[in-house]
């Protein structure tokens, strides 16, 4: 799911991507008019919660109110990172940062395995999210693959060198407010016995 705006000349700007379990339109809880549209990229299951029911729940359950407030603040933090990327990062860094962000957010909901995750967005989607043309995105993806930072096969992205990608992107997951995820990685020792090692993510 993504939030987007269509400008007067018909061009689209993707404002954010949303993962499983996210509120895609939380601002509508208190704002009568939204300045964005919500669209889907893949088939999704949408759960609708009446505003009044959610407001009552927030009024009677302080922890729920705190969670909603935290979600809104995290949303704002992500928007600031995106603004910084589009305004000051190179094309190379923009895509690197976005792929790191996807990894951290999908890890938090158990959708990353061996640094590999589904990436159902098109190059046009990536362009509209990062302020580039689709041609520039295509060229930058080739550069990331040539540097052996990522592998992209169909709709599946694998991060080949997390440490280098994080350094290039200047990525720090703190703004996402997600738990650090330990990813099991099979290792074969010199005796041929498989053991599990855990790579701590930033």
Where are these regions (language model features)?
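N-terminal functional module of multi-domain proteins
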Residues: 1-15, 26
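Cyclic-nucleotide recognition modules
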Residues: 16-81
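Short hydrophobic/aromatic patches on the structural cores and recognition surfaces of FHA
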Residues: 38, 95, 137
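Polybasic "coupling" helices that flank or enter modular domains
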Residues: 42, 59-131
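Phosphate-/nucleic-acid-contacting segments
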Residues: 105-202
